[in-house]
Curated annotation (Swiss-Prot):
Enzyme Commission number, as recorded: 2.7.1.-
Residues in the signal sequence: none
CDD domains: KdgK
Name this protein carries in UniProt: Uncharacterized sugar kinase YdjH
Gene name per UniProt: ydjH
Keyword tags: Kinase, Transferase
PROSITE patterns: PFKB_KINASES_1, PFKB_KINASES_2
Amino acid sequence: MDNLDVICIGAAIVDIPLQPVSKNIFDVDSYPLERIAMTTGGDAINEATIISRLGHRTALMSRIGKDAAGQFILDHCRKENIDIQSLKQDVSIDTSINVGLVTEDGERTFVTNRNGSLWKLNIDDVDFARFSQAKLLSLASIFNSPLLDGKALTEIFTQAKARQMIICADMIKPRLNETLDDICEALSYVDYLFPNFAEAKLLTGKETLDEIADCFLACGVKTVVIKTGKDGCFIKRGDMTMKVPAVAGITAIDTIGAGDNFASGFIAALLEGKNLRECARFANATAAISVLSVGATTGVKNRKLVEQLLEEYEG
């Protein structure tokens, strides 16, 4: 694709969700489940998949191994019409695989490969020449790939802004004890930041949504969108604040990828020129559908599902 809407940079891995499991899984010799299956996972491929299904042209920039798991990812991208021109395959590494242990109430713990592709992704895997082809850059999760540190992120975002791209970013909890100071310069280029409340509280050391948002705004983030789970989201831009409630009546089966789905919905709405509240409502609806199925990209099969839920949603 020569003309793109979004470039997603970040992890592309394979998830093996095991559900439902209980806390006593290690107290028995055998733990039968109804079904065990592989799905694609990782923040960037999750976003690329959902944004593509929502109707926008999307490219994935990541690094995978030249192995069975990597081929699984390539096949998925082709099926979902995701541009993989800048998805690098490296014969010297293993594609990261995450085994997700998911409880009955949707909470999860990951068992991960510390030496997999997720940990090898670095700035050399970013194809800057393609930035001019897209409108928006999504750095799918700050801290997820440790080699994409504050310095690397600053370079990526500088290159994106030189091409007038909108920059969105999500984050996870720091893996290597990174601090807000480590990424503050990079954040000064970010137009929309999508942390969840627990991650943002940990990183900033603040307790309230307002205080947390102010820390990110002080770094130069233009709009802070804090995901608050069952409460929806909190938005702050300058002196303007807004709370947008979640979709009511949703019972989560699996929360894996819910944040990625939220970001995807928000990004899709941004590209369509929707205002902040409309973007948040669309994001909340996208996330709500995602948690009703096992797997990060299983629930949101098409745009129609989101639009149908929006008709019932009073956010």
